[in-house]
Amino acid sequence: MYKPIEIADRIYSVGCRDWDIRDFHGYSTYEGTTYNAFLILGEKNILIDTVKEKFADEFLSNISKIIDPKKIDIVISNHTEMDHSGAIPRLMQVIGEEKPLYCSKMGAKNLKSHFNRDFNFKVVGSGDEL
């Protein structure tokens, strides 16, 4: 099991390790891979990316070791491949589907298509700042 790691002051790696995967986008992964997600604590608590759906419980447990997941204010989805976004439905169910989910225009379209859900998307474009 992957444990949360504080990588800088109030910034945590909260992803998961998949020991079983042997091929990732054409690369051999004989020792598995990690699904990276990051929690930033501050005026607003921000989560960047999630993990594959089958690791959702472990992912939420990692977050819970740092803060109550319901205290996450903002979720950012960098891209919609399932190793980054698969746990979004479970996460949003836990933290509250009214919480903003920041992503690109195409990200919102893809996430709607993947999950058949209309989360509280906040579309950002190149050069936008949060």
Predicted feature residues:
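Hydrophobic/aromatic beta-strand patches that form the interior of the parallel beta-sheet core
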Residues: 12-14, 46, 76, 102, ...
